[in-house]
């Protein structure tokens, strides 16, 4: 990529809309924009807005609002100009064509964020978070990406780096100045333990982060012909599952994504639980049992017109709700159990609103206090942190085994370099500065 040229691109999605935005960034952003704007752009103060017209070769394109942000006080760290025009395809595309003809280059995908990273406005973790913010399809995924973009994950990585550097400084004293008074070796071990605690906390958050981003899994289970598939269709407002009066119609796992008040839920319809000699149906039943074990919640659907069936033990091992379906045909019986119960009718919609409210409170309770926690969702981050952990554990073992300090320092340097892969920073030699700041070497 040419780092000193000026780029331009349409920043809003294509299609009809009230406003479209064309963004320009680079050393010539102001001069190039001045060639198509009606006002004196070079004289505009930073962070000001100006109403005017965009024209090219004597032809007016559109009335626009120009926003100017001078370097380094911009997203990319360069001079940035944004032109807000009427929405739709033609206005913004003609403005972009005019800018390109006057010297701007069409930006590559993600190039504005890449320049922000290269100019030190954001680190690599934050750059990745921008894409996750845009792609988020539920509130949990959005909150996780927002947390990363705000720098909370980066702060953890910086803390890990600082602890590694501090440990390495002590080890370098042993290697480079063996004749001097040796420092307390409990200090580097303590720093490594602190770093490992942070790393373990981040690594352990990966599965939970994946679950939050992908959605809470809830299984619809119960005996055959109780109305599980009808309930799936009623909740999602789609005819997704085949519904018949024949028991055992559902023989495989059917998953449907559903959004409830911004929360993504993976509804899983499963085969009815009963004794059967049919090998295909039996396979479906076993898959249903496996799905219940892996799910975060179970909706156990029962037929209100039938006697209460026995409840499987798994319902008492995770959040579960007993649903008496077909309440429009009969008054549901009550089971003497600690599990909550609700009467519904998937056919008429009775009780569906109450069920949605119950599920919403269910999820809110499970996720209480999690919005402020740092979760991993990237396999790249997860893999790198595992590598760092391996290096630090090896270094710690070397300390305890009193291996030569050069070998311990090698593991720590590997860990430090790998940590830089998270933030995208270049690893500089700062160990000598750390040593001089902590010890009077010549004394």
Swiss-Prot record:
Keyword Nuclease: no
Domain of life: Bacteria
EC number assigned by the record: 3.6.-.-
GO biological process: tRNA methylation; tRNA wobble uridine modification
GO molecular function: GTP binding; GTPase activity; metal ion binding
Function: Exhibits a very high intrinsic GTPase hydrolysis rate. Involved in the addition of a carboxymethylaminomethyl (cmnm) group at the wobble position (U34) of certain tRNAs, forming tRNA-cmnm(5)s(2)U34.
Similarity section: Belongs to the TRAFAC class TrmE-Era-EngA-EngB-Septin-like GTPase superfamily. TrmE GTPase family.
Protein name: tRNA modification GTPase MnmE
Organism, as annotated: Chlamydia felis (strain Fe/C-56) (Chlamydophila felis)
The encoding gene: mnmE
């Amino acid at each position: 990529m040419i780092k000193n040229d000026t780029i331009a691109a349409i920043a809003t999605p294509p299609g009809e809309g009230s406003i479209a935005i064309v963004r320009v960034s680079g050393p010539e952003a102001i001069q190039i924009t001045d060639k198509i704007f009606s006002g004196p752009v070079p004289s505009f103060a930073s962070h000001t807005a100006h109403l005017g017209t965009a024209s090219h070769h004597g032809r007016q394109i559109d009335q626009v609002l120009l926003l100017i942000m001078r370097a380094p006080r911009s997203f990319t760290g360069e001079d940035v100009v944004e032109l807000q025009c009427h929405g739709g395809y033609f206005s913004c595309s003609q403005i972009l064509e005019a800018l390109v003809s006057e010297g701007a280059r069409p930006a590559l995908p993600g190039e504005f964020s890449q320049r922000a990273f290269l100019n030190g406005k954001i680190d690599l973790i934050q750059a990745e978070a921008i894409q996750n913010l845009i792609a988020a399809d539920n509130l949990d995924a959005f909150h996780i990406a927002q947390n990363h973009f705000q720098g909370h994950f980066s702060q953890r990585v910086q803390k890990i780096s600082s602890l590694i550097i501090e440990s390495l400084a002590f080890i370098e004293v042993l290697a480079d100045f063996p004749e001097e008074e040796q420092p307390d070796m409990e200090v580097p071990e303590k720093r490594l333990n602190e770093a490992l605690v942070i790393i373990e906390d981040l690594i352990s958050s990966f599965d939970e982060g994946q679950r939050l981003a992908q959605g809470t899994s809830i299984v619809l289970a119960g005996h055959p012909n109780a109305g599980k598939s009808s309930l799936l269709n009623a909740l999602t407002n789609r005819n997704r599952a085949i519904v018949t009066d024949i028991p055992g119609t559902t023989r495989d796992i059917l998953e449907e994504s559903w959004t409830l008040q911004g929360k993504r839920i993976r509804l899983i319809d499963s085969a009815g639980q009963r004794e059967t000699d049919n090998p295909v149906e039996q396979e479906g039943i076993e898959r249903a049992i496996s799905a219940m074990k892996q799910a975060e919640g179970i909706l156990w659907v029962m037929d209100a017109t039938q006697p209460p069936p026995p409840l499987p033990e798994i319902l008492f091992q995770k959040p579960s709700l007993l649903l008496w379906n077909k309440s429009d045909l009969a008054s549901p019986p009550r089971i003497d159990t600690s599990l909550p119960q609700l009467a519904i009718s998937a056919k008429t919609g009775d009780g569906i609103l109450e069920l949605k409210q119950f599920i919403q409170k269910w999820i809110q309770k499970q996720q209480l206090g999690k919005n402020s926690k740092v979760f991993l969702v990237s396999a790249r981050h997860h893999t790198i942190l595992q590598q760092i952990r391996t290096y630090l554990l090896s270094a710690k073992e070397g300390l305890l085994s009193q291996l030569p300090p050069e070998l311990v320092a090698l593991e720590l340097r590997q860990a430090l370099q790998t940590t830089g892969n998270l933030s995208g920073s270049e690893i500089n030699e700062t160990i000598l500065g750390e040593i001089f700041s902590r010890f009077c070497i010549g004394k």
